[in-house]
UniProtKB/Swiss-Prot annotation:
Reaction(s) catalysed by this chain's protein: 2-(N(omega)-L-arginino)succinate = fumarate + L-arginine
SUPFAM superfamilies: L-aspartase-like (SSF48557)
Top EC class, one word: lyase
Name of the protein: Argininosuccinate lyase
Annotated source species: Staphylococcus saprophyticus subsp. saprophyticus (strain ATCC 15305 / DSM 20229 / NCIMB 8711 / NCTC 7292 / S-41)
A Gene Ontology BP annotation from the UniProt entry: arginine biosynthetic process via ornithine
Compartments (UniProt record): Cytoplasm
Any one Gene Ontology molecular-function term assigned to this protein's record: argininosuccinate lyase activity
InterPro entries found in the cross-reference section: Arg_succ_lyase_C, Argininosuccinate_lyase, Fumarase/histidase_N, Fumarate_lyase_CS, Fumarate_lyase_fam, Fumarate_lyase_N, L-Aspartase-like
Known EC number: 4.3.2.1
Length: 459
């Protein structure tokens, strides 16, 4: 007799290497707790609807919990020839409790069973990701609050542009993560839907109660179409997209961490706990954790593209191609969770080199816009002021000095409206404090940002 759940139709058994190719047990065992959870809900509903007896239901629940406990204690042997975690559990259940275990699958197909497991898994992991993002946001905010008055060069085109505060810069990543978190939160509306009871594709003749299992599994909604229930993988694509975009944001942050920690910048010092050395160069301290996060974006984005390509040509309803929805999602979730934990620890433990940042911003031309604004405030049209300042910058470069060192007579030869107060005006800390527009880098604006953030984080 075949050990296949579908073996009655077949006169030949697949060879072991075919079983290996077909099997998903080596990765879908990740779903075991959700499979047990879904099966217990299904059994309770079957008993409530008098489709199975209360005695059978009790045996099923006791057996499923025992199987899960054995798995968690590494006492459950999984069989590749049984294909997946779902059939492994069913086979083990029947072996332990007999015919009662064989009644569990009444009114259910692996199609809606697997879909239910995946919805439960994705819902749980998205909520876990939201918590990790929030935790990282707290770390960013704590760092920002310590550096509201720390001045650094702001960049465009990786060229120094204008003085900003370190707090303003790092809070940019808070807002990126806030959008990421919002996308994950919104996606729960499309994840938190029960497909259980859709069966293979057309529903079932048994008098099941899909709303009962929805309630037992704490789903907020239920699929209205049984074919849509078993063929929908939009929520997986959406989750992979949200993971990929979050990883892109972490990659951008990682790139800055790598640059900031270089000897050329020396803006920050990373903790030894988040750095590695060289096997040949004993002086090296490498930002490997940041580099790994930057590199893993290709991995998560690849999973997104793979899922889209898997779905693009599939007819309704279920197709075996959909088995490919799991490994990419599991790996993407694992990758983002690890990246968030690493980044949180890396930022929490880094040292901001305040004096180096101040030295850098004093030794550049990032205050040139302020000189133009100074002239505008004296009635010079901005375009004319821009031209004057450009010539002063060129003269300064030719004489190897910065704007704070330009002699007053040189300023006045460029424009007679420039007075001795220009030197105080051009100090980087004053450039920053004069930024008063909403959302700007000025201390009052940054504090306003932080007040808004604290309210959001406490809600």
């Amino acid at each position: 007799m075949s050990n296949k759940a579908w073996g009655g139709r077949f006169s030949e058994q697949p060879e072991d290497w075919v079983d290996e190719f077909n099997a998903s047990i080596h990765f879908d065992k990740t779903l075991i707790q959700y499979d047990v959870q879904g099966s217990i809900a299904h059994a309770k509903m079957l008993a409530k609807q008098d489709i199975i007896t209360d005695s059978d239901c009790d045996q099923i629940i006791e057996g499923l919990n025992a199987i899960l406990k054995d798995y968690e204690q590494d006492n459950l042997e999984l069989d590749t020839s049984l294909e997946d975690i779902h059939l492994n559990i069913e086979h083990e259940l029947i072996k332990r409790i007999g015919d009662a275990g064989g009644r569990l699958h009444t009114g259910r197909s692996r199609n809606d069973q697997v879909a239910t497991d995946m919805h439960l898994y994705t819902k749980a992991e998205v909520n876990a990701l939201i918590e990790l993002i929030t935790q990282f946001q707290h770390t960013i905010v704590n760092t920002a609050e310590s550096h509201i008055n720390t001045i650094m060069p702001g960049y465009t085109h990786l060229q120094r542009a204008q003085p900003i505060s370190f707090a303003h810069h790092i809070l940019t990543y808070y807002w990126m993560l806030e959008r990421d978190k919002s996308r994950f939160q919104d996606s729960l509306k499309r994840i938190d839907i029960s497909p259980l009871g859709a069966a293979a594709l057309s529903g079932t003749t048994y008098p099941i109660d899909r709303h009962e299992t929805q309630s037992l599994l704490d789903f907020s909604a239920i699929y209205e179409n049984s074919m849509d229930a078993v063929s929908d993988r939009d929520y997986i694509v959406e989750t992979l997209h949200n993971i990929s975009l979050t990883m892109v944001h972490l990659s951008r942050f990682a790139e800055e961490i790598i640059f900031w920690s270089s000897a050329e910048a020396n803006f920050i010092t990373l903790s030894d706990a988040f750095s590695t050395g060289s096997s040949i160069m004993p002086q090296k301290k490498n930002p490997d954790m940041a580099e790994l996060i930057r590199g893993k974006v290709g991995r998560t984005t690849g999973h997104l593209m793979s899922m889209l390509m898997t779905l693009k040509g599939l007819p309704l309803a279920y197709n075996k191609d959909m088995q490919e929805d799991k490994e990419g999602l599991f790996d993407a979730v694992h990758t983002l969770k690890g990246s968030l934990r690493i980044f949180d620890g890396m930022i929490d433990s880094m040292t901001v080199n305040v004096e180096r940042l101040q030295q850098t911003v004093y030794n550049d031309f990032s205050n040139a816009t302020e000189l133009a604004d100074y002239l505008v405030n004296k009635g010079v049209p901005f375009r004319s002021a821009h031209e004057v300042v450009g010539k002063i910058v060129l003269w300064s470069i030719q004489h190897n000095i910065y704007l704070l060192d330009v002699p007053l007579e040189q300023y006045q030869s460029a424009n007679e409206l420039i007075e001795a107060d220009i030197y105080d005006y051009l100090k980087p800390e004053n450039c920053v404090s004069r930024r008063i527009s909403y959302g700007s880098t000025g201390q009052s604006s940054v504090q306003q940002q932080l007040d808004i953030i604290h309210k959001e984080l406490s809600d």
